[in-house]
């Protein structure tokens, strides 16, 4: 072959020119791109590259590949087995270590072997030496014992003298102890040396082998990455790794099938079972369960909060939720696993199941907030809070008007009080705060709140009317609140006034006049003329002095919500009666489920004020929502904590309400299943104040019967909004506004959806119209009335109709269109209708009393002489509640 250039040679071998020039340079030849290359130079370069790549040296790496093919029978879905070919490929790479490394490892192994032999030899020598020393010690001990025995025998035969220690025996004993201590020290030191040598040898071997192991691991990973390998992980592939394993599997399957085909109960089968039981491996003792089922019932201390679900209660008692559900079914209550239970119900269930109950208080933050108050302030006298109670139209508000020199009763709708009015009056002898409560039966909760917040109750009884139902209820509220009661016998200016009758009737309910030796003061008054009003005020102040009413004046205020409403321009407004402390503008108030900072304060006359002391009623603005009447209002220090407490109360109120609703839903469901479908009258109710809203809801709830139920789907305080109208339209409800009106947007929705809208200002009218609507929803009642009676005198046969009864109408009137009954001996034997009614061969629509007629009964021919034909009508009767 002729010489060639470097550039052509690079193109032939498939390398770049620069790389080829670099390899020539490494081989000791300097070449450029245009230089020629001879055959000798090519061979020289080839020899260098072979040497560089190790072609001439002994190979240091060897790879072995193995491939095995086997057949495995696998059961198919059709019940037949099919053969599956399984191919297993294995690849293993061996790497030869360097000679220097092998020599070093061999040297280390030789050293370790020599060291181990030396240690073994030393150990054998030490053991031999120890055995010799032990033998010498034992011989010395035996010799000493023999000498001691001989001496003791000699002493027995000689007279008793004082013993003297043998010097030789003592010396032998000391020498034995010294040898023993020396042996123990030598043995301990030898063990320490052996442990140190073994640790050093292990460390050296680890240093040598760590590099080798790392290199082998790297080479193995490279081989797996670059080589053709197959990892078998499936159960089938592992089972088919060897053909002999597959054959064993087939033989085992045939043996199992053969055993399965044996007759049951035979001797072979029994022997096989016994052999199987003998050969069956038992689990090791360490795998046995450490838990044993309790032999007796376990009683736990169950901590229950204000509300808890059934699943949470089961977790606390370490039982299944089904046990609690069964227990509550036994107690007469149906629950689900996620139903919320109140604290009392959960306590009963836990105690029934034999556990101890610990009731926990979750409102710790609320307790801390309410406890953080000024308690070190002195008490001062305060004005009495007087509640005026009595029956409707007995003159409560008129009497208060005369005291206040104002006309409030004229402004009330219908002349009756429908709100709690709070007023304070300055008299010559001091200040008095009056609460005017409604007297109508619907306002029971209002009167109860008035009695709770009061110091003295004035019971107004009309002298011409006497004791009435709400009078008795007021007496009960006063007694329940343990409040002193003063009776004001009103309307004494009327000619038919009879105060003695009032005293007599009140005595039947435990109210005895002081004139009759009782404890109650009776004052005769007239709201028109003012008779006895001064004596009444003096009696109130006298009673307050006896009670010694005192309160904190300069501390943080606390009171009770008398009334609340949602004002369109001002937002939530609450009337609060301050009971202690001084309420100031800017205070943070926690009021039931609501909280807020007081933005403005007004008295009962609408005048702006900045603070209010004890026994002063005041209107406040700035709460987050409308509080419920009767809630306690408390001034707190931190608005953030007040918000947390209010949110906590709202969540708890929601949980308790949900628990009650679920319980009532289940009860209603079972009642409906028993009694059938119940008609519902849906109502969306809005009122001007919270107290009126509660009174209306209670009155409407009392109207519900077994057949018609009043369902108040939404209630609230404030004007009727578009949301209320939309809800009423969606639920087919009546929209009711009590002393409130609908805004413009709500009126558009009401007109477009044709919602039934009702406005009321007097509670009587509202209740009467709802009762009338419920009456219209009652299922009609039908009654059968007998309108005529005819007696059969003779029977004729007609080829077209059949039997024709010749009758005489003895009572009422017989109509052809009315249904009839055929009576024989006053027993109904047929009920149907007339087919023919004739008089003198002419069809007649009706035949009256005392006339004869021919009657053909449809589908009935067994009419006999003496039978009676009774004609009746079904009449619908209107029902009332």
Curated annotation (Swiss-Prot):
UniProt region (G3), positions on chain: 436-439
Gene3D superfamilies listed in its UniProt record: P-loop containing nucleotide triphosphate hydrolases (3.40.50.300), Putative DNA-binding domain, N-terminal subdomain of bacterial translation initiation factor IF2 (3.30.56.50), Translation factors (2.40.30.10), Translation initiation factor IF- 2, domain 3 (3.40.50.10050)
UniProt binding sites for GTP: 390-397, 436-440, 490-493
GO cellular component, one term: cytosol
CDD domains reported for this sequence: IF2_eIF5B (cd01887), IF2_mtIF2_II (cd03702), mtIF2_IVc (cd03692)
Compositionally biased tracts (Low complexity): 198-207
Compartments where found: Cytoplasm
Region (G2): 415-419
Biased composition (Basic residues): 252-265
InterPro entries: DNA-bd_dom_put_sf, EF-G-like_DII, EFTu-like_2, IF2_assoc_dom_bac, IF2_II, IF2_N, P-loop_NTPase, Small_GTP-bd
UniProt domain tr-type G: residue ranges: 381-550
Region (Disordered): 142-170, 192-288
Residues covered by region (G1): 390-397
Cited HAMAP family: IF_2_B (MF_00100_B)
UniProt-recorded name of the protein: Translation initiation factor IF-2
Lineage of the species this protein comes from: Bacteria, Pseudomonadati, Pseudomonadota, Gammaproteobacteria, Alteromonadales
Gene symbol of the encoding locus: infB
């Amino acid at each position: 072959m002729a010489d060639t250039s470097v550039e052509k040679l690079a193109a032939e071998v498939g390398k770049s020119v620069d790389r080829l020039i670099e390899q020539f340079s490494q081989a000791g030849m300097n070449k450029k791109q245009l230089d020629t290359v001879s055959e000798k130079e090519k061979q020289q370069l080839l020899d260098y590259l072979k040497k560089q790549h190790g072609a001439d040296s002994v190979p240091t790496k060897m790879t072995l590949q193995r491939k095995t093919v086997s057949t495995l029978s696998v059961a198919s879905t059709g019940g037949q087995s099919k053969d599956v070919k399984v191919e297993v490929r294995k690849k293993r790479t061996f790497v030869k270590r360097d000679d220097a490394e092998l020599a070093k490892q061999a040297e280390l192994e030789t050293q370790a072997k020599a060291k181990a032999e030396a240690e073994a030899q030393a150990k054998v020598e030490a053991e031999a030496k120890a055995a010799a020393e032990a033998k010498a010690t034992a011989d010395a001990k035996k010799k000493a014992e023999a000498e001691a025995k001989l001496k003791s025998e000699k002493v027995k035969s000689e007279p008793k003298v004082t013993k003297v220690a043998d010097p030789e025996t003592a010396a032998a004993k000391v020498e034995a102890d010294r040898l023993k201590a020396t042996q123990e020290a030598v043995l301990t030191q030898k063990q320490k040396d052996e442990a140190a040598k073994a640790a050093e040898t292990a460390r050296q071997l680890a240093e040598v082998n760590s590099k080798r192991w790392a290199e082998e691991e790297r080479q193995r990973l490279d081989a797996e990455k670059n080589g053709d390998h197959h990892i078998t992980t499936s159960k089938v592939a592992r089972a088919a790794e060897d053909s002999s394993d597959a054959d064993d599997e087939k033989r085992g399957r045939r043996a199992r099938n053969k055993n399965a085909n044996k007759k049951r109960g035979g001797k072979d089968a029994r022997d096989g079972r016994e052999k199987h039981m003998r050969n069956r491996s038992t689990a090791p003792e360490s795998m046995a369960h450490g838990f044993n089922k309790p032999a007796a019932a376990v009683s736990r201390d169950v901590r229950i909060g204000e509300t808890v679900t059934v699943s949470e209660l089961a977790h606390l008692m370490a039982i299944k939720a089904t046990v609690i559900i069964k227990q509550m079914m036994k107690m007469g209550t149906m629950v689900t696993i996620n139903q919320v239970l109140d604290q009392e119900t959960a306590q009963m269930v836990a105690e029934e199941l034999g556990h101890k109950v610990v009731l926990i208080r979750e409102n710790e933050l609320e307790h801390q907030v309410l406890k953080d108050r000024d308690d070190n302030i002195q008490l001062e006298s305060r004005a009495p809070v007087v509640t005026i109670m009595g029956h409707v139209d007995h003159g409560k508000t008129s009497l208060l008007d005369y005291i206040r020199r104002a006309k409030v009763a004229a402004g009330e709708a219908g002349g009756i009080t429908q709100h709690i009015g709070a007023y304070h009056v300055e008299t010559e002898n001091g200040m008095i705060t009056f609460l005017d409560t409604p007297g109508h039966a619907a306002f029971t909760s209002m009167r109860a709140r008035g009695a709770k917040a009061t110091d003295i109750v004035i019971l107004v009884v009309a002298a011409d009317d006497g004791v009435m139902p709400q009078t008795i209820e007021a007496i009960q509220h006063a007694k329940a609140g343990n409040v002193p009661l003063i009776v004001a016998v009103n309307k004494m200016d009327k000619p038919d006034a009879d105060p003695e009758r009032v005293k007599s009737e009140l005595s039947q309910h435990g109210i005895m006049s002081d004139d009759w030796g009782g404890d109650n003061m009776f004052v005769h008054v007239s709201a028109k003329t003012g008779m006895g009003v001064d004596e009444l005020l003096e009696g109130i102040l006298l009673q307050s002095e006896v009670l010694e009413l005192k309160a904190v004046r300069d501390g943080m205020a606390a009171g009770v919500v008398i009334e609340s409403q949602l004002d369109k321009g001002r937002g939530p407004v609450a009337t609060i009666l301050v009971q202690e402390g001084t309420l100031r503008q800017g205070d943070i108030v926690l009021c039931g489920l609501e909280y807020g900072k007081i933005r403005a304060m007004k008295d009962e006359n609408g005048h702006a004020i900045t603070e209010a002391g004890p026994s002063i009623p005041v209107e406040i603005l700035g709460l987050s929502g409308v509080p419920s009447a009767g809630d306690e209002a408390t001034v707190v220090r931190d608005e953030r904590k007040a918000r947390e407490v209010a949110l906590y109360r709202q969540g708890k109120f929601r949980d308790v309400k949900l628990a009650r609703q679920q319980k009532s839903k289940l009860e209603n469901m079972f009642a409906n299943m028993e009694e059938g479908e119940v008609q519902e009258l849906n109502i969306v109710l809005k009122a001007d104040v919270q107290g009126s809203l509660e009174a209306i809801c209670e009155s409407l709830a009392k109207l519900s019967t077994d057949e018609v139920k009043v369902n108040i789907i939404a209630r609230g305080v404030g004007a009727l909004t578009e949301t209320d109208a939309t809800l009423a339209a969606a639920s087919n409800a009546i929209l009711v506004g009590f002393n409130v009106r609908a805004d413009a947007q709500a009126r558009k929705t009401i007109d477009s959806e044709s919602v039934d809208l009702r406005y009321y200002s007097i509670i009587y009218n509202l209740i009467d119209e709802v009762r009338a609507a419920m009456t219209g929803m009652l299922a009609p009642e039908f009654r059968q009335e007998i309108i005529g009676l005819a007696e059969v005198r003779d029977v004729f046969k007609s080829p077209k109709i059949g039997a024709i009864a010749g009758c005489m109408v003895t009572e009422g009137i017989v109509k052809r269109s009315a249904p009839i009954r055929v009576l024989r001996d006053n027993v109904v034997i047929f009920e149907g209708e007339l087919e023919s009614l004739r008089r003198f061969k002419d069809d007649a629509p009706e035949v009256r009393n005392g006339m004869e007629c021919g009657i053909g009964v449809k589908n009935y021919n067994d009419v006999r002489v003496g039978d009676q034909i009774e004609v009746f009508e079904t009449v619908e009767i209107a029902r009332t509640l």
